[in-house]
């Protein structure tokens, strides 16, 4: 079948379709599988979503897990309650992940993680790594909050907060706050570093500028 266009599709259970597929709205209560590319305005899947190709959408909400073989571009919200496995890059207005996400790179305005991310990098204006979450990769953001007990490989940001008992290998920031019990191996700051007396920072060095230029409005 060639390029199939669907106005609205509602499935209570599971469905498998051949792509490339274009649709306005797809809602599947169980699992949804497309052999090929999918372009859709609204995609809602209660269980498992699998796209063997590229995914382009206005909004994606998945209660369970999503797997794509290639890249994902979402204009507004990309929200996953369980796990997301993206074969290429993920670009979205807002990314919210409750469980785990794996992708090459993530580009968004807002990135909120409540679990684990295995990625090369995240670039977002606003980044929130929730309590006890883990990021295996680099985080670039205008404002970055590493929540209590979270673990992150590296952060480069304008305004960075490392909350209580969080661990970050390397931080570069214009302004940074490191709370009680937090651990940072290497800290580089341009303007200001507030380090709690009970935080563990192996080395803190004032530098002239960040190693990467971030596009942010002045704080």
Residue map of PLM features:
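Intrinsically disordered, low-complexity terminal regions
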Residues: 1-219
């Amino acid at each position: 079948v060639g390029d199939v266009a669907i106005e609205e599709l509602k499935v209570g259970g599971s469905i498998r379709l051949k792509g490339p597929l274009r649709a306005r709205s797809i809602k599947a209560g169980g699992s949804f599988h497309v052999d090929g590319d999918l372009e859709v305005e609204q995609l809602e899947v209660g269980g498992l979503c699998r796209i063997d190709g590229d995914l382009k959408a206005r909004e994606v909400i998945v209660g369970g897990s999503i797997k794509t073989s290639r890249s994902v571009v979402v204009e507004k919200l990309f929200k996953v309650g369980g796990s997301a496995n993206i074969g290429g890059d993920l670009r979205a207005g807002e990314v919210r992940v409750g469980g785990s996400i794996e992708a090459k790179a993530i580009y968004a305005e807002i990135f909120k993680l409540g679990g684990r991310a295995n990625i090369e990098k995240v670039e977002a204006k606003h980044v929130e790594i929730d309590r006890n979450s883990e990021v295996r990769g680099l985080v670039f953001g205008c404002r970055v909050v590493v929540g209590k007990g979270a673990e992150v490989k590296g952060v480069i940001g304008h305004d960075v907060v490392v909350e209580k008992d969080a661990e970050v290998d390397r931080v570069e920031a214009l302004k940074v706050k490191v709370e009680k019990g937090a651990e940072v191996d290497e800290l580089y700051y341009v303007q200001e570093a507030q380090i709690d007396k009970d935080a563990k920072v192996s080395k803190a060095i004032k530098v002239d500028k960040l190693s990467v230029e971030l596009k942010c409005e002045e704080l």
